[in-house]
């Protein structure tokens, strides 16, 4: 039994050894396959990482290409030994308030515009700049005087002595009417001057009207007239109203001529309005300041007609003219003159050049028939006798 037992154990050992010898090469092959698989996996991962890294690098390079910086960035600190650059000088005008200067400029411009607008509004409101119609050669401008004081002066270049006087007419309203043709450049600009008709024109109009019931004065060209008017209760009466019409040229070419009015009449009436609200119960006072002393002497009979004229003058329409001059040779006299009656209405209508011949003919006929007065110089200057004045005027008899 003992011999049989070892034999069985030996047999089992041999079988085990043979089995181990057969198992070892297979396991080695399997280990090799696993190692190769692991290595290939790592190699694949590394390849993928390399591809991703290359892609990122290319993408960043394209980005930098698109974002090119125009200047070179300084990465190195500047040396302290180098001199510093000089600072820029400050502009002192930057401190000034620019808005205030602009406002100042705008204010100056606005002031200019305001003055221009005031002139334009003044010209537009005035009746001088109203366009006249084509058919009307004359344009009348009426100035109604109510409760105001007007200083009216006739100016001339001649420097001569003057005398003062007061006349008291009973008229309460005065309408001064002037044609547009006779208006001068100064009247178109300032509207302060009104042309007064000359003595010859008034004489022609008086001869044409042939009204013996009117007493009118012919103003010389070298007189200074001052009107002082205050409101009266009876000013609304149409009968107590005096109107003056200034005749002008017929053709409309005189408007373009600036000196047309001065050739027709050199007398300008300056009217300056002053409010008089406190005084309302006075009458109109007219002061005539003449350059020389004139006395109304009849042309035919100096003694008879003068006395008759002095008798016909009413007490309410007589003004005493007193001469006050510094010249010792000038004679002082009181001259009585008649003015418009309270019921008379003086009307001077403008006439044209076509009627000049008829006016002159009528004037000659009326001068021969009626007893007109002539102004004769009575003052004796330098030992001379009484001579007739240079501007002999005609006054129609009442």
Curated annotation (Swiss-Prot):
Extracellular face residues: 1-37
Membrane topology reported for the UniProt record: Single-pass type III membrane protein
Region of interest called Disordered, as start-end residue ranges on this chain: 228-261, 298-330, 347-398
Phosphotyrosine PTM sites in chain numbering: 193, 268, 294, 345, 373
Ranges of compositional bias, category Basic and acidic residues: 320-329
Side Cytoplasmic, residues: 59-398
Induction: Up-regulated in T-cells following TCR engagement.
GO cellular component terms given for this protein: cytosol; Golgi apparatus; membrane; plasma membrane
Post-translational modification note: Phosphorylated on tyrosines by Syk, Lck or ZAP70 upon TCR or BCR activation; which leads to the recruitment of GRB2, PIK3R1 and GRAP2.
Gene Ontology biological-process annotations: adaptive immune response; antigen receptor-mediated signaling pathway; B cell activation; immune response; intracellular signal transduction; lymphocyte activation; negative regulation of MAPK cascade; negative regulation of T cell activation
Cellular compartment(s): Cell membrane
Residue ranges, compositional bias (Polar residues): 303-318
Tissues showing expression: Expressed in spleen, thymus, and peripheral blood leukocytes. Expressed in several B-, T-, NK and monocyte cell lines.
Spans through the membrane: 38-58
InterPro entries reported for this sequence: LAX (IPR031393)
GO MF, one example: protein kinase binding
Its job: Negatively regulates TCR (T-cell antigen receptor)-mediated signaling in T-cells and BCR (B-cell antigen receptor)-mediated signaling in B-cells.
Subunit relationships: When phosphorylated, interacts with GRB2, PIK3R1 and GRAP2.
Name of the protein described by the UniProt record: Lymphocyte transmembrane adapter 1
Lineage: Eukaryota, Metazoa, Chordata, Craniata, Vertebrata
């Amino acid at each position: 039994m003992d011999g049989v037992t070892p034999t069985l154990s030996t047999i089992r050992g041999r079988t085990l050894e043979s089995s181990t010898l057969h198992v070892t090469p297979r396991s080695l092959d399997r280990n090799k396959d696993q190692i190769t698989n692991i290595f290939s996996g790592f190699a694949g991962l590394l390849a993928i990482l390399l591809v991703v890294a290359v892609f990122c690098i290319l993408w960043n390079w394209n980005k930098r290409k698109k974002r090119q910086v125009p200047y070179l960035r300084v990465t190195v600190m500047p040396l302290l030994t180098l001199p510093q650059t000089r600072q820029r000088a400050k502009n002192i005008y930057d401190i000034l308030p620019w808005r205030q200067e602009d406002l100042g400029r705008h204010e100056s411009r606005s002031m200019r515009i305001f003055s221009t607008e005031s002139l334009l509004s003044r010209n537009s409101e005035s009746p001088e700049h109203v366009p006249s119609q084509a058919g009307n050669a004359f344009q009348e401008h009426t100035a109604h005087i109510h409760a105001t004081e007007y200083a009216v002066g006739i100016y001339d270049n001649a420097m001569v002595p003057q005398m003062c006087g007061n006349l008291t007419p009973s008229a309460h309203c005065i309408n001064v009417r002037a044609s547009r043709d006779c208006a001068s450049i100064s009247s178109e600009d300032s509207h302060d001057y009104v042309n007064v008709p000359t003595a010859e024109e008034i004489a022609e109009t008086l001869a044409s009207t042939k009204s013996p019931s009117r007493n009118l004065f012919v103003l010389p060209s070298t007189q200074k007239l001052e009107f002082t008017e205050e409101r009266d209760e009876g000013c609304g009466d149409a009968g107590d109203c005096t109107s003056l019409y200034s005749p002008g040229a017929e053709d409309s070419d005189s408007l373009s001529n600036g000196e047309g009015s001065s050739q027709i009449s050199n007398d300008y009436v300056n009217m300056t309005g002053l409010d008089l609200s406190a005084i309302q119960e006075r009458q109109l006072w007219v002061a005539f300041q003449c350059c020389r002393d004139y006395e109304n002497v009849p042309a035919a009979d100096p003694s008879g007609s003068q006395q008759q004229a002095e008798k016909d003058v009413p007490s309410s329409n007589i003004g005493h003219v007193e001469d006050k001059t510094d010249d010792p040779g000038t004679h002082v006299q009181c001259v009585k003159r008649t003015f418009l009656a309270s019921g008379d209405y003086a009307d001077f209508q403008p006439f044209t050049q076509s009627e000049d011949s008829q006016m002159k003919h009528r004037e000659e006929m009326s001068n021969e028939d009626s007893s007109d007065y002539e102004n004769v110089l009575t003052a004796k200057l330098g030992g001379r006798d009484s001579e007739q004045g240079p501007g002999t005027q005609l006054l129609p008899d009442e």
